Structure formats: C-alpha cells, structure tokens
Amino acid sequence: MIPARMASTRFFGKPLELVAGIPMVVYCAKNAEETGLDVYVCTDSRDIQTTCDSYNIKSILTPECATGTDRVNIAMNEIDSKFVINLQGDEPLLTSKLLNKIITMMPILNHFDDKIITGVEPIEDPSDINDVKCVLIGHKVHYFSRHPISNYKQVGVYAMSKSNLKKFASLPQGELEKREKVELLRWIENGFDILGCDLNSNTISVDIPSDLKKVNLML
C-alpha cells in the first residue's frame, strides 16, 4: 500500500513529479509490483488517482488523513489481507530487490504479532534533518529522531499485521511523535517493538526538490 498526497509541506505535488520520465508515485508502484504482490496507491487526490488509472496502477480514494499510516489503515478496510507493507510514495530508489528483504523478514510477524518491521540503512552524514535517524541495537529500534543521534536512518517502508495497523491508528499521538514528527514513535511510546531490517543500501527519499534532481541523476 502506497500512501500519497499532493499537500506535502516541503514539496507540494511531489507524487506527480517525474522520475525517469514517469510520475514518482507510479515509479514507486511499478517497483513494488515487481515483487509479485498486489499494489495499491491510497490517496485523497483525484489527480493522483487519475494518474494511477492512466498507468494501470490500482488506487483507493480516502479522505484527508493526519499521517500516511492512518491513510493506509482506512484503505485496508477494502482489502482482505492479514499483512500490509506501507511503502512511502517518495522512495523511488526502493527497488523490488530491497523490498524483498523486508518481505523475507515478515514471517517473524506470524510469531510476534505486536511488532512492526521497518527498513533501515547506514548513512555517512547524519546531520540532514530530513533523514529520520534511528538507534538500532541488534534488530531492535529503540528511538527515532531527526537529530544526528546515529549513523543509521529509517527508510520509508514498514510491514505489519493488519491488526497492528488498526491498533496503531487507534493509539493517540504521544509527545515524542509530535516533537520529532516521526509517526513510528507512536508505536514505541505505547510500549511496542519495532524491528529494523538493514537494507544495506544507499537510497534517497524525495523530501525536497533538490532530492528529486539527485534521484534522477542516479537513474
């Protein structure tokens, strides 16, 4: 499930900006489709939905939502599945090979239903506030911050059970989530575990226009 909205505060309209000649949200969806799983874009924008239709990408229209995970939760009401992967629509460098690393780790969720898996990767410069850094000990993520607290960052993909998705959406936002503007802190603040899947990659999340230029130079 790929949540996408036009009203990004740092880069308005970025889902429809071009990556390698096609809209970024479509590029992300096509990467995800290469895993063989069913892929949907969930959005409150009819422009995004129309664009997805033109590329034969399945989409679900939702109301406005506070976070991408809240949007995925609403969209999943229409999908019969025990598990869900939330892939951010601004991660065009997350290839099917990298997504398959997350998928390979997902059987853990059959035995530990209170856990969420997120992608992580090493970074050389932790000073960029657009990158969400994470404190990783073993496979467990202990904290997320936009401050330079470690040399690992969170990558915009996470897997969980559908029941945990609903639980996540029902939990109140805590002070840490509000302060750091990192939604996965909600799970940690409420006493649950997040596991990091080291993708051992070098991806770029498109947060601002200059990121888009970097991504297109890499493709």
Regions found by a protein language model. Name each.
Residues 16, 134-136, 196:
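A structural signal for short hydrophobic beta-strand segments in well-ordered beta-sheet cores
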Residues 1-43:
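N-terminal glycine-rich phosphate-binding loop and ensuing alpha1 helix
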Residues 153-219:
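Conserved alpha/beta core of the MobA/IspD/sugar-nucleotide pyrophosphorylase nucleotidyltransferase superfamily
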Residues 36, 81, 109-116, 192:
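Short, high-confidence coil segments that cap the C-terminus of an alpha-helix
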Residues 40, 46-104:
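Short phosphate-binding loop-to-helix
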Residues 95-174:
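Conserved core of the sugar-phosphate nucleotidyltransferase
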Residues 38, 58, 191-195:
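Residue-level detector of anion-binding/catalytic polar loops
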